[in-house]
């Protein structure tokens, strides 16, 4: 098994940190400190070395320390391709983020070629009652760990969708280019939908097979394209192309694309109660979310033979002793780099003896 882990992390003008240097090993790491000390900021900085905008989905300007014109995050990381230096930096003057791998610029969506990462934060506990967009992004992030190429597909799809919207709204008379764009969107949509369905199948097996202290969930996706694939229908790409053509006039008025895989919703049910997670109690929702993360970790490692970095922000808070102990044993048993934030060590004293403690 190949482990993804940080050897060192350096922050400059990042959120509340002027400068911070951390040296780490492939062991559990506990960040301990008062609220506001910057524990979550460190996790967020690490998460920037995975496709997307990090675990907070923050605006670029927000990650830069107030009154500073730039910020920099540097990491020496054991990646899928070996030891490498990664940097990501932002300058207010350009309002752009630049990411580099061994001093060569790379696109954000290329990061999944090098890293694998999973995180769980208090903000995610409301994912079942939030927007379908949040749930869809959560599912796609899971897919990235199974299929790194999925990142590029989603990025390309969003690019072509933006181009289509622009042509329609600005009334650009170029039917040939519009036809090409819609054909590309249709082809990419088919791949995205199949990747999601394949991952959900893997995940469902993992949930059903893994006996733990958390409720089992039934996973599905509510989307027209995905449903047609599940029904065994043929000519999916032609169907999508036709739908995009037929909705042009309506989408021109709306200013957006009303049909496609960007409208699909990730649905989660409490298996035993047979009700959607959004109708469960907040405690049950947190437990179901943890169960999904456990399944993702377990199956991703089995399938890819790669152990990702795991970021847990205040996860042990409000868990009973039995579930807390199960999580500790599960994660330490995987022999991976685990980052945990907490305000105190109450309830995790034994775990702390096996971890690197960083006090903020």
UniProtKB/Swiss-Prot annotation:
Keywords: ATP-binding, Cytoplasm, DNA damage, DNA repair, DNA replication, DNA-binding, Nucleotide-binding, SOS response. InterPro entries: DNA-binding_RecF (IPR001238), DNA-binding_RecF_CS (IPR018078), P-loop_NTPase (IPR027417), RecF/RecN/SMC_N (IPR003395), RecF_2 (IPR042174). It is found in: Cytoplasm. ATP binds at residues 33-40. Coiled coil: none annotated. SUPFAM superfamilies: P-loop containing nucleoside triphosphate hydrolases. Gene3D superfamilies: P-loop containing nucleotide triphosphate hydrolases, RecF/RecN/SMC, N-terminal domain. One of its GO terms (cellular component) is cytoplasm. The keyword ATP-binding applies. One of its GO terms (biological process) is SOS response. Pfam families: SMC_N. One of its GO terms (molecular function) is single-stranded DNA binding. The RecF protein is involved in DNA metabolism; it is required for DNA replication and normal SOS inducibility. RecF binds preferentially to single-stranded, linear DNA. It also seems to bind ATP. Belongs to the RecF family. NCBIfam families: recf. This is DNA replication and repair protein RecF. It comes from Rickettsia massiliae (strain Mtu5). The gene is recF.
């Amino acid at each position: 098994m190949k482990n993804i882990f940080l050897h060192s992390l350096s922050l400059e003008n990042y959120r509340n940190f002027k400068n911070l240097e951390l040296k780490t090993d492939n062991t559990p790491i506990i960040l301990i400190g008062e609220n506001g000390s910057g524990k979550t900021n460190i996790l967020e900085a690490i998460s920037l070395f995975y496709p997307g905008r990090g675990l907070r989905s923050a605006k670029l300007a927000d990650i830069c320390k107030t009154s500073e014109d730039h910020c920099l995050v540097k990491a020496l990381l054991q990646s899928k391709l070996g030891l490498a230096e990664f940097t990501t930096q932002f300058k207010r003057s350009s309002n752009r983020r630049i990411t580099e791998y061994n001093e060569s610029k790379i696109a954000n969506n290329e990061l999944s070629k090098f890293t694998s990462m999973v995180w769980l934060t208090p903000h995610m506990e409301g994912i079942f009652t939030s927007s379908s967009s949040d749930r869809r992004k959560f599912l796609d992030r899971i897919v990235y760990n199974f299929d790194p190429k999925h990142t590029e597909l989603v990025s390309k799809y969003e690019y072509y969708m933006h181009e289509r919207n622009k042509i329609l709204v600005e009334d650009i008379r170029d039917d040939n280019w519009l036809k090409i764009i819609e054909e590309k969107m249709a082809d990419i949509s088919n791949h995205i939908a199949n990747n999601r369905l394949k991952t959900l199948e893997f995940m469902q097996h993992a949930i059903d097979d893994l006996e733990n202290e958390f409720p089992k969930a039934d996973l599905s996706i509510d989307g027209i394209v995905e449903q047609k694939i599940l029904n065994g229908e043929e000519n999916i790409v032609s169907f999508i192309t036709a739908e995009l053509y037929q909705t042009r006039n309506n989408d021109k008025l709306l200013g957006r694309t009303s049909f496609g895989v960007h409208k699909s919703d990730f649905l989660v049910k409490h298996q035993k109660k047979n009700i959607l997670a959004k109708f469960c109690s907040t405690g049950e929702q947190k437990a179901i979310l943890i169960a999904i993360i456990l399944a993702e970790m377990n199956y991703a490692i089995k399938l890819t033979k790669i152990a990702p970095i795991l970021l847990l922000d205040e996860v042990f808070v409000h868990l009973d002793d039995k579930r807390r102990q199960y999580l500790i044993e599960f994660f330490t048993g995987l022999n991976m780099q685990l980052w945990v934030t907490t305000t105190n060590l109450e309830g995790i004293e034994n775990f702390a003896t096996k971890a690197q403690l960083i006090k903020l």
